[in-house]
Amino acid sequence: MPHTITCVELHADEWVRLRDIRLRALLDSPHAFGGTYEKENQLDEQQWRLDFAKQTHIVASVNGIDAAMMYVENLEGDFGATCWVGGCWSDPDFRGVGLMRAMFGFLDKQAESRDWLVQGLGVWTDNDLAIAAYEKLGFIEMGGPQASTRQPGKFYQRMIRKTARA
């Protein structure tokens, strides 16, 4: 059965939607994130709303069900990055249907107007599946592994992707 994927930018009034998908992600894939379910489950409405002040949150839905998420933060980053992408996750029930490709397509359509032309991200060095998925989207590894400040003993790899207009 074909899937209808819809990508939207969430706004602060949709903080519950962000919270719900983020907590699902932390329960499903705790190894993939710097944060923890235990800590983020304790955040109140004000703390969730504050996150919207510094980051743009994107959610992809499949036939009306929130199935993937990411955030984008504008910054002057390593290797010329104009933004940093993080918090990428897709629901295991919907993996393989093109959610990440759809969300990066959503970003690319706005890249010029929002200064998202050179996208950077960090991925744990032991997350081979995510690294391969990002490479399929055009990301390349840059620099060597970096020590995590949020999870001592873990290392992440920086990856960069330039959009067609960069």
Indicate residue ranges for each PLM-predicted region:
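C-terminal "cap" of GNAT-fold acetyltransferases
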Residues: L117-V118, W124-I131, E135-A166
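Conserved phosphate-binding and hydrolysis motifs of nucleotide-dependent enzymes
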Residues: G64, A68, G98-M100, G138
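Structural signal for conserved beta-strand scaffold positions within catalytic alpha/beta enzyme cores
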Residues: V8-E9, E141
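Short, low-complexity, intrinsically disordered N-terminal peptides in bacterial proteins
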Residues: M1-T6, R165-A166
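Short coil/turn segments at beta-strand junctions that form active-site/ligand-binding loops
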Residues: T56, D115-L117
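Conserved glycine-rich acetyl-CoA-binding loop
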Residues: D78, G87, D91-G105, S113-R114, ...
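Acetyl-CoA-dependent GNAT
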Residues: A12-D93, F104-F106, Q110, P145, ...
